[in-house]
Amino acid sequence: MAKKSSVEKQKRRERLVQLKWDKRKELREKSYNINLSEEEREQARIALNKMPRDSSPIRLRNRCQMTGRARGFMRKFKLSRLTFRELASMGMIPGVTKSSW
């Protein structure tokens, strides 16, 4: 199990990213728009830099939904490799079987 504080911090970041997504997208588009004046583009970059760091999606980390483990994450199932192995061996994940040849 991951520390509860790490999992809560991740949830807080996810909420902040979702909340600021539109504003961040708008500022990013302004800063890359070559039809605007250089001053307007610079203002957009400054405003983007003043936004909270945690509102950037880069700071998000994939975590296992059951344990909160950040490493060994399997995107398709949203589980860590350890949890995935446990559940798969118990037959709790539909369509997943142990291979043999």
From Swiss-Prot:
Organism this protein belongs to: Protochlamydia amoebophila (strain UWE25)
Gene3D superfamilies xrefs: 1.10.287.1480
GO cellular component: cytoplasm; small ribosomal subunit
Similarity comment text for this entry: Belongs to the universal ribosomal protein uS14 family.
Assembly and binders: Part of the 30S ribosomal subunit. Contacts proteins S3 and S10.
GO biological process: translation
Protein name: Small ribosomal subunit protein uS14
Residues spanning the signal sequence: none
Stored SUPFAM superfamilies: Glucocorticoid receptor-like (DNA-binding domain)
Matching InterPro entries: Ribosomal_uS14, Ribosomal_uS14_bac/plastid, Ribosomal_uS14_CS
GO molecular function: rRNA binding; structural constituent of ribosome
Domain of life of the source: Bacteria
Native organism taxonomy: Bacteria, Pseudomonadati, Chlamydiota, Chlamydiia, Parachlamydiales
Keywords: Ribonucleoprotein, Ribosomal protein, RNA-binding, rRNA-binding
Purpose: Binds 16S rRNA, required for the assembly of 30S particles and may also be responsible for determining the conformation of the 16S rRNA at the A site.
Gene expressing this chain: rpsN
